[in-house]
Amino acid sequence: MRKMIAIIHYEYKMQFKKLATWGVFLVVTVFTLLDNYPSASNLARLEFLNEPAYFVYRTMSLNGFVLMFGLMFLLSERFPLDNKTGMKLLLMSHALQKKQYILGKLLGGFLYTFSILCIFLAFNTAVYFVVAPFPIPLLECTVPLVKAIIVSAFPVSLFVSLCSVALPGMIDIRLFYLFAAILFGINAAYVGSANAAPFYMITSGDLTRFIWVNPKWSFNDTESILANGAFLMGSGLVFGGLLFLRHRFWRSE
């Protein structure tokens, strides 16, 4: 257990201190504020921008998607980089079990992704609360933020981190990038509507309807919400689990 925690700590700390992480964070945050800043022009352009819940919803579904796309590239190199630098051989020379190594990588990647996404949502919501040219009760910002973290950020982080870390450990990383580009491309092309969203939406699926729902739409399709959650969490756990079954991955195989 101690060795697995050491790997989790290393993965989390190493990724968190990367300049690339904060470069991605900064770029996406700037674009988020340009797009959603409660200025007169943006308030006129976005009908519901005066609602904190809509701001959190939009930040999570649109800008959070771009953030996840950037973090995907940083996460995808974890196993290939260990092979390339010889770190995996070094770790295998110690009394470290396969499951400790894999779990450490996966959990470290998840905690890193979830932390960055939570910081992103909290920071942008705080800016919105401070600069909005109209009074906002603190609870009106806090409640949708907590909802976004629990019902959206958690399953999204689980899906993106486990898939991005695990799949390049099983297949050629270029093939992973191809699959990821197709999925992210389909997600980027989707335009929301009153109808149920496809279950494979990453940040703009029906789980986000817990955060905010367009008052002009009536939506009661709980099945699509469950399908979206099952896809995100189920896919992440399945792909993460498959890595444990891969043969010739560890010294004893």
What function would you assign to each model-found segment?
Residues 69-81, 117-118, 153-168, 195-212, ...:
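Juxtamembrane/interfacial segments around transmembrane helices
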Residues 86-87, 161-162, 178:
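Transmembrane alpha-helix boundary/hinge residues in polytopic small-molecule transporters
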Residues 99-117, 188-200:
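C-terminal halves and exits of single transmembrane alpha-helices
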